[in-house]
UniProtKB/Swiss-Prot annotation:
Pfam families: DUF576. The chain crosses the membrane at residues 6-26. It is found in: Cell membrane. It is a single-pass membrane protein. Belongs to the staphylococcal tandem lipoprotein family. It comes from the Bacteria. GO terms for cellular component: plasma membrane. This is Uncharacterized protein SAUSA300_0205. It comes from Staphylococcus aureus (strain USA300). Keywords: Cell membrane, Membrane, Transmembrane, Transmembrane helix.
Length: 257
């Protein structure tokens, strides 16, 4: 009888310890996510950059090996893609190069269209652009008024979005490697998120489409300066082709020596 009692006492102790340890692990993981979200909030709060020309005066990640006469360049890229079953059907892409030395922003707007019935039948067009007084203008004449208006009114989420609102979602997972400063955020966003609303309105995406988000980049999560980052939005609707919006901001510092 005594041995039987000891057995149950030991079992109860093991269960209690397991519950306490599991609870501590859960709280530790929850606290880590809160801490990482706070760090990402510092990074994302440096946006929006409403005037792209202010990037002339903004430095990216620091590197002591570079000299003062290095060529500093920001690259801003966005793309809107319609993807069928393992194939790209349509893509519109804007790429801008912000030269901090010459104080010039140049780039191109590309369109790619693939025929769903004939994979070899694709159309690619490219339109050179530049930015003057924070407005995108063509460097060559474009006769299509609708396309011209579409490109000239183009804005990046880093200009007009509310990136910190992404962190309000309860369905997010954030990881950060302090050794490399690489971070990754992934999860789902509701239709009420202002960035989701803006993209759906801009690209005529179905209102009921579900949205997944992914954010990748390099940062110490202290928000000291703008860092390289890539942002992805995945829109899915039953029976519809998937729509992907990508946007990236990268900094390139090339030594002349």
């Amino acid at each position: 009888m005594k041995a039987h009692k000891i057995f149950w006492l030991n079992l109860a102790a093991i269960i209690i310890i397991s519950i306490v340890v599991s609870g501590d692990m859960f709280l530790a993981m929850k606290w880590e996510q809160i801490h990482l979200k706070d760090g990402l909030k510092k990074v994302l709060s440096t946006y929006p950059i409403k005037n792209l020309e202010t990037l002339y005066e903004i430095d990216g990640h620091d590197n002591p090996h570079y000299e003062n006469n290095d060529q500093d360049t920001w690259y801003i890229e966005s793309s809107y893609s319609v993807v069928g079953s393992d194939e790209l059907l349509k893509e519109d892409r804007m790429l801008l190069k912000v030269d901090k030395n010459t104080h010039k922003i140049t780039g191109e707007y590309d369109t790619t269209t693939n025929d769903k019935k004939n994979a070899t039948d694709s159309t690619y067009k490219s339109y050179p652009v530049k930015v003057v007084n924070n407005k995108i203008v063509f460097t060559k004449d474009v006769k299509d008024p609708a396309l011209k208006q579409k490109i000239e009114n183009n804005q990046f989420l880093i200009q007009s979005g509310d990136l910190t609102s992404i962190l309000n979602s309860n369905d997010l997972k954030v990881t950060h490697d302090p050794t490399t400063d690489y971070y990754n955020l992934s999860g789902k966003l509701s239709n009420d998120n202002p960035n989701v609303k803006q993209l759906k309105r801009r690209y005529n995406i179905p209102k009921n489409a579900s949205t997944k988000v992914e954010l990748k980049g390099m940062s110490d999560l202290k928000g000291n300066n703008h860092q390289d980052q890539k942002l992805y939005f995945y829109f899915s609707s039953p029976g519809k082709d998937q729509i992907i919006y990508k946007e990236s901001l990268t900094y390139n510092k090339i030594s002349e020596h």
